[in-house]
């Protein structure tokens, strides 16, 4: 009988996977939509944006259980969409304030309609809501099936390496 994967190993892998997915999303926007060319969108060296990893973990923590809950009926995709919008917008606002505190500005929504202090805006919030649907209904179930096939030792080893790489990258940026 295969043991269930270690919870911290799954958390680390979810964090990295969606940090990379977020980085790819941002780069695709920069290169193909805004046509500003390639720029590393984050404050870390590697191809990942931790804000997306944290957002994905919060989606997983709050919305996945809500989506699966049978006691009060399962959440509708509309509820998941709205929950994703709220979570992502709050994460983006808090992250934006934290970055400003350290003298960094990695995004600015001043030119968007319905923005707040250039840190959040309706348009990106709607996109994050759609991203939450993609995450909870398509990407995360695929990822969970992939994880379930891996031996616990492999998952723990991968998570340890990921943690070390992220820690070294963060320390190098200080």
Task: Describe the predicted segments one by one.
Residues 1-174:
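Aromatic-rich, lipid-facing transmembrane alpha helices and their immediate juxtamembrane interface loops
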């Amino acid at each position: 009988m295969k043991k269930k994967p270690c919870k911290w190993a799954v958390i680390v892998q979810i964090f990295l996977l969606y940090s990379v997915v977020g980085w790819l999303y941002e780069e695709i926007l920069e290169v193909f939509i805004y046509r500003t060319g390639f720029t590393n969108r984050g404050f870390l060296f590697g191809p990942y944006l931790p804000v997306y990893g944290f957002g994905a973990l919060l989606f997983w923590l709050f919305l996945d259980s809500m989506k699966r809950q049978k006691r009060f009926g399962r959440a509708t995709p509309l509820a998941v969409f709205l929950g994703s919008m709220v979570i992502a917008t709050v994460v983006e606002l808090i992250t934006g304030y934290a970055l400003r505190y350290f003298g960094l500005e990695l995004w600015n929504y001043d030119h968007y309609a319905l923005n707040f202090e250039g840190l959040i805006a309706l348009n990106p919030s709607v996109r994050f809501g759609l991203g939450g649907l993609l995450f909870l209904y398509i990407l995360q179930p695929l990822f969970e099936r992939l994880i379930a096939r891996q031996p616990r030792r492999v998952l723990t080893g991968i998570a340890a390496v990921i943690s070390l790489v992220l820690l070294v990258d963060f320390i190098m940026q200080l």
